[in-house]
Amino acid sequence: MSHKLTILTLGAVLTSVYLAGAADFTIIQKNKAISVRQITIKVEDRITFVNDDSVTHNLYSETKGLEFEIELQPPGRSDTVQFSQPGVAEVRCAIHPNIKLQVHVRP
């Protein structure tokens, strides 16, 4: 019985560590600007981009290995991005060139 309890306890601890591993971040787009210019996250963390603006945005990164594109993001929509490797993603808006963000992704 004690072996079974030990295995169950170990499983619960490992599950908690796994679930606690990724963090969630929120970045707001408003007034044709972005709420931060730079952020540091870890691999597998999630960034949710919220369009709290009155205009459409189009965020993307062409950084090798960290590419993504949130095509047309109308006002009120949220989209989440997750990076699977370390590096520095240069994020831009295809519609508003003044929107720039550096995402530093650590291992």
Model-derived regions, located:
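Domain-edge interaction signal
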Residues: 10-12
